[in-house]
Amino acid sequence: MSQDGASSQAAESQRAVAKSRSQVLRKMWARKPSQAPALAQSPVMSWPLILVSLLGGLASLLAWNGRTQPDDWASLWVGGLLMDRGLESHLYDADPIDFTAMSGEVWPRLAQEVSAPFTHPFVQNPLFAKALGAISHVMSFETSVAWLLFLSGMAVVVLVAASYHLWFRSTMPWGIAALVTACVFALPTTLNSFWIGQTTPLIVAGVAYGLAASRTRHWLAGILLGIVASIKLTPYALIAVMLFFAYRRRAALWSLATTAVLAVWMFIRVDMSVISDWIDRIGDIGSSVLVGGANQSLASTLATDLGKPDLLVTVVRDYPSHVKTIPLCIALGVVLMVTAVAWLNPVYRFEFLITGAWLIAATFSSILWTHYMLMLVTSVFGLAAMARTRLTRQWPYIGIALLVVLLTFPVTNPIAATPYTGGFMYSGITAMLLTLALMLVVGGCHAFAVHRYGDGDAGEVGAGLGSELAAAETLKFPQPEPMVLFDLRKR
């Protein structure tokens, strides 16, 4: 009797455990998207990461101050001087053939007031020149370069931490952030940004932080993205994608509101003739093909023979139709492939779509400078995040290694090469296209492994006793975000 009682108790215990397991699994699978736990409650920048960013800014300042040739920053600074001194009618004076040369006498005269030897015409929003004109009252050009170096060093840390947070949905450990930042500092794309005084680290870090924080800090992420979009037009493509996601829509609306406020402020503070000149300048760049080794866009590589060998970048207005249609057709095809992979990969749907949109907008634009490659940091973290299934366990890291080798190859290094070096103009577009291909393949394999084998982001789900609990543990990891259109099939 005692043995029968013990066996019956054991059977009841097993039934209770099985029932509890089934109830847990049923509740977790039945959870609605709106009831899913927040994916990004942890801060993008913790206090240790903020300290690391300050140290990164200090390191870049000590390493580069007085050792740069900030031609690009000088162009922005001269634009600010023109606005401040009532010479805004000359803000967009540019040579019709040489993209890097100014026209007239006003630009060269003011360019002599800065220490950079090669300034180029202003192409940004005139409101940006207005802001720089105000800054010129409180600091000299040399002081502004020092501040740019410090802020750029901080921005690299923010870029690394925000890219990690976007894909891994947790705060990046500060020690790993410091190590990765040191590696990013050594990349030629970063060296190029610091050397010529580019604002790209600030722009890219602003975009990455805005995307990572768009779920929890709607107003901050939205305002930041709105400001960046007013300076560089590419983020508008990202804002459009964010509107389709319920948890990101509020940040997108904040972005649109910010750009609207800045647009109204521009029409109030800037003469219509200057705004018209800016619109004409942007339209001229978009309708032309900028050919030269410095511009590594696909259109530039297709029209290499049309450029003047003595010019760094030639503005070509008469070109074969295939120079524009081939990049457009490839871009449309990549858009369809990115959308298809995102459809099949709900866990990383937002991250995949937003990173894909960012890559596509930059890869197939009219201009692709070397310092634009800094945005690939976000994609590298995406490849690492999706490398946690049996089909994507090791070889994505081989792809990352190939990408790093490509970006650090001497022909792409601004210290070891120039835009006139053979092969230089192909390095950027090759890196961008390689990254897009890696994202599509890794994303597709990740989706297939999850659907076919049940692999989760915690690793492969074990078989046998306890496999249900292992699956339940996998569900504790980030859940798919609800999205308009993609989720209609589930309703």
Show where each model-derived region lies.
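Membrane-embedded alpha-helical segments of multi-pass membrane proteins
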Residues: 151-154, 198-206, 231-236, 256, ...
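Hydrophobic alpha-helical transmembrane segments of integral membrane proteins
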Residues: 45, 184, 236, 375, ...
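Aromatic-enriched
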Residues: 382-491
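Primarily membrane-embedded glycan-assembly and transfer machineries that use lipid-linked glycans
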Residues: 2-5, 13-220, 247-370, 452-457, ...
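Hydrophobic/aromatic-rich transmembrane helices and adjacent perimembrane loops
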Residues: 369-386
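Membrane-interface alpha helices of multi-pass inner-membrane proteins
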Residues: 219-233, 237-243, 357-364
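Hydrophobic alpha-helical segments of integral membrane proteins
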Residues: 60-61, 226, 383, 441
